[in-house]
Amino acid sequence: MDPYKVIVRPVVTEKAISMVERENKLTFIVDKRATKPDIKKAVETVYEVKVDKVNIVITMKGEKKAYVKLKPEYSASEVAARIGLF
């Protein structure tokens, strides 16, 4: 899949912002057909970071939400600031 089509939008909620600050995780709504390797590759390509792991949840609305944990040498706060979450 095209990395720019995998990530639909970032999630901007209190929980998502607290995860950025405390756990070095970013939260995105992603394409329903995307797999964990697709999401990892897309985040690494689009935001120029290294991903540690990806967790996926299908929401009650039918959207696929991805929790992306970054490697310790990268800051989720800096990436969030670049994409306009803060």
UniProtKB/Swiss-Prot annotation:
It holds the Pfam family Ribosomal_L23. Disulfide bonds: none annotated. GO terms for biological process: translation. It comes from the Archaea. InterPro entries: Nucleotide-bd_a/b_plait_sf, Ribosomal_uL23, Ribosomal_uL23-like, Ribosomal_uL23/eL15/eS24_sf, Ribosomal_uL23_CS. SUPFAM superfamilies: Ribosomal proteins S24e, L23 and L15e. GO terms for molecular function: rRNA binding; structural constituent of ribosome. GO terms for cellular component: ribonucleoprotein complex; ribosome. Keywords: Ribonucleoprotein, Ribosomal protein, RNA-binding, rRNA-binding. HAMAP family: Ribosomal_uL23_A, Ribosomal_uL23_B. Part of the 50S ribosomal subunit. Contacts protein L29. Belongs to the universal ribosomal protein uL23 family. Binds to 23S rRNA. One of the proteins that surrounds the polypeptide exit tunnel on the outside of the ribosome. This is Large ribosomal subunit protein uL23. It comes from Thermococcus sibiricus (strain DSM 12597 / MM 739). The gene is rpl23.
